Amino acid sequence: MPTPEPVEQALVLLRERGDRVTEPRRRVLEALASLPGHPDVTEVHAAVQQLGPTHLATTYRALEHLCAAGILTHVHLDHAPARYHFAAQVTGVAHAHAACRGCGSVLDLPTEVLQPAREHLEARGYRPHLGHTALSVTCPDCAPADRRAGR
């Protein structure tokens, strides 16, 4: 059976939780689905505004609620705003992240790549949340400048 579109799957999961499907939440989901990659709140809000007038604080509250509900997740990048995307329970695919410290581009990584780190942490009693952070990397486009800077 094909996986439903992320917005429809997210709405189903919200209703199953007993959450209300408000217009701002729906707009945030639709906006996020329309954007490439891992947008930050400014990018999400700009896309939400295309769907109808919405205050920035409302967008923040909707993102916060959808993250708390496990519908969305966010990743923290070096000294930059959080980036948002649909959670694995919506897409059916868990992933980790690598973020270029030069340009900020984000690459999705299969979670298996971090399995040794997960096992190392779990053996010591830690519960890693590897999808919530990003490995700091230098992408191929930024590598020449990185080398010139001696990094």
Predicted regions and their residues:
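Short capping segments at the starts of secondary-structure elements
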Residues: 21-23, 34-40
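Short, hydrophobic-biased segments on the C-terminal half of alpha helices
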Residues: 60-64
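Pre-recognition alpha-helix immediately N-terminal to the DNA-recognition helix
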Residues: 26-31
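Short, Lys/Arg-enriched N-terminal segment that forms or immediately precedes the first helix
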Residues: 4-18
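Short acidic, hydrophobic short linear motifs in intrinsically disordered regions
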Residues: 39-48
